[in-house]
Amino acid sequence: MASPDAPINLTNQFLIAMPGMADPTFSGTVVYLCEHNERGALGLVINRPIDIDLATLFDKIDLKLEIHPLAEQPVYYGGPVQTERGFVLHDAMGSYSSSLTVPGGLEMTTSKDVLEAVARGGGPQRFILTLGYAGWSAGQLEEEIGRNGWLTVQADPEIIFNVPAEERFAAALRLLGINPAMLSGEAGHA
């Protein structure tokens, strides 16, 4: 049995915002945690598409999107940090210049080479592109979880890549056996 003071590692987990989430930035969100350690945490909101699609974004960065079925794929709000920067969450390929490999078979890439590969049709088959990320300083996320701000569950890539954005919150809750209609923002302490 782990010590109550043992550090927890939530890398490759979903954070599911509780109804009582104090920060409206994260209300109703599911965050995929790409990294969590003693220095803090970094994740991407996976269920908040913004009013821009891949074709429009690629035009803005002077890339021609040759794979037309991807043109209308939404870009997502990844979080409030560095919202002008792109973050690509995709199946692990190990072939891009600036990727963070996440245990569980995914990578988060911030270099333009992944977008160039997508534009040519040679990029990852499954990916989402976010603008910005969510970040927490050391101990901050653990404190928010302790205040009943988040639920955590092992991530399922199928939810990220194959479930429509508007259904990802409910799908993540179902991983915990929770009916979204029955979720309360009130914390109970024995």
From Swiss-Prot:
Q: Which family does it belong to?
A: Belongs to the UPF0301 (AlgH) family.
Q: Which Pfam families match?
A: DUF179
Q: Which Gene3D superfamilies match?
A: VC0467-like
Cite a GO CC annotation.
cytosol
User: By what name is this protein known?
Assistant: UPF0301 protein RSc0675
Q: Give the species this sequence originates from.
A: Ralstonia nicotianae (strain ATCC BAA-1114 / GMI1000) (Ralstonia solanacearum)
